[in-house]
């Protein structure tokens, strides 16, 4: 009988982001496939949903970028690796990656990294800091965009003996499914948000930050009214400001200046995202900087909603333009308004057809089981070498 593979995942915080949900999904997949699954994290809202009988969660301050804490964490992670006899350490962020690099060196364990973002670098020191994500035996890029970004910017940091590959992020298609939506809950949320009947609902999900382009989205809604005389919509900007109070105030002031405060609804959080998607007629991703993957676009398609997204980053891979959604020139509110107006003129059957094609697209390429199975297969290959 072969021994169970023991995998330790390390992530700063187990919240609702793409990296975090990927960690959560993989942790449970491993437990259900005869592995021992462990997660080190500092905390996060997703912890309460972890099946404690399947996945062991260990809390450490791995969110800290303080060099002293990074060294302390490396000592503690080393003890955890030895105590639980961990085979593979899979890390998803830079600060804890430095801790894990030291721990894996001391314990001679295999390290895996997932390169989740573009990790901006303005100087050589920052680039060296980022390069820790390339020090593992297996480097996973969540999209072709990230794969190309690594090759274009870090080719001098890549060790040819390490494996760099694309494993597309996946989502839970059973969770993101229209069939699970309760009419009662849908009506309740509709009333809670104060939405109106017979208005075209435009949903923009994502935390409030300038690179997500919420300000450009509001400008596009003003153009929709001014240039197209189109008032037939309500827009929901769904996301926490995460302490960015000044930016949120800017968005609210912009909404008032354009006399759109009766048409734009700012919602801080919705724990049931499939329910939120179900209220919409179209979903928008207005990012002005590249998304590493573009989870919103994939979730929207899974929920059979047309998606409009800026033509940069991962969205170009997840959306089939003019079939499952529409791409527009990023940072261009005028073009976004034009696309919005065109989508609003489509009949219900055409919108449903686009939604159905979106679901097919996600089922084929971005299923969470496929992501987890591919990762698990690579783990086994790594342990054989």
Protein language model regions, located:
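Short His-centered aromatic/hydrophobic patch
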Residues: 91-97, 115
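Active-site donor-binding acidic/aromatic loop of nucleotide-activated sugar
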Residues: 243-248, 261-270, 276, 326-327
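Conserved acidic donor-binding segment of nucleotide-sugar-dependent glycosyltransferases
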Residues: 321-322, 326-334, 342-348
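A conserved, positively charged/aromatic
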Residues: 105, 111-144, 148, 158
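A conserved mid-protein helix/loop that constitutes part of the nucleotide-sugar donor-binding site
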Residues: 20-25, 200, 204, 209-226, ...
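A short, active-site helix/loop in glycosyltransferases that binds the activated sugar's phosphate group
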Residues: 136-166, 171-176
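Short hydrophobic beta-strand element within catalytic cores of glycosyltransferases
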Residues: 306-309, 319
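A short, well-ordered alpha-helix in the C-terminal region of glycosyltransferases
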Residues: 188-191, 335, 342, 349-365, ...
């Amino acid at each position: 009988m072969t021994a169970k593979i023991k995998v330790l995942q390390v992530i700063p915080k187990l919240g609702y982001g793409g990296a975090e949900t990927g960690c959560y999904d993989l942790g449970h997949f491993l437990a259900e496939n005869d592995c021992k699954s462990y997660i080190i994290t500092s905390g996060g809202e997703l912890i309460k949903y972890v099946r404690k009988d399947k996945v062991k969660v260990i809390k450490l301050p791995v969110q800290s970028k303080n060099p002293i804490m990074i060294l302390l964490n490396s000592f503690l992670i080393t003890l955890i690796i030895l105590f639980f006899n961990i085979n593979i350490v899979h890390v998803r962020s830079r600060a804890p990656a430095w801790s894990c690099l030291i721990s894996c060196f001391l314990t001679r364990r295999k390290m895996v990294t997932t390169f989740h973002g573009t990790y901006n670098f303005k100087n050589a020191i920052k680039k060296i800091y980022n390069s820790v994500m390339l020090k593992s035996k297996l480097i996973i890029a969540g999209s072709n965009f990230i794969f190309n970004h690594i090759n274009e910017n870090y080719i001098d940091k890549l060790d040819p003996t390490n494996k760099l590959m694309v494993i597309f992020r996946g989502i839970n298609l059973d969770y993101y499914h229209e069939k699970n939506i309760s009419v009662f809950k849908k009506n309740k949320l509709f009333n809670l948000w104060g939405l109106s009947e017979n208005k075209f609902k435009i949903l923009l999900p994502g935390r409030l930050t300038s690179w997500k382009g919420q300000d450009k989205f509001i400008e596009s809604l003003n153009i929709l009214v001014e240039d197209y005389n189109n008032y037939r919509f309500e827009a929901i900007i769904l996301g926490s400001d995460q302490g960015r109070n000044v930016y949120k105030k800017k968005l609210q002031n912009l909404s008032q200046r354009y006399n759109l405060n009766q048409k734009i609804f700012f919602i801080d959080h919705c724990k049931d995202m499939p329910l939120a998607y179900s209220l919409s007629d179209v979903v928008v991703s207005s990012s002005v900087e590249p998304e590493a993957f573009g989870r919103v676009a994939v979730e929207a398609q899974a929920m059979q909603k047309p998606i409009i997204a800026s033509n940069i980053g991962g969205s170009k891979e997840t959306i089939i333009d003019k079939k499952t959604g529409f791409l527009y020139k990023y940072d261009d509110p005028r073009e976004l308004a034009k696309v919005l107006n065109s989508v609003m003129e489509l009949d219900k059957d055409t919108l449903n057809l686009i939604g159905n094609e979106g679901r097919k697209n996600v089922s084929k390429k971005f299923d969470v089981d496929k992501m987890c199975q591919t990762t698990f297969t690579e783990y086994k290959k790594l342990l054989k070498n």
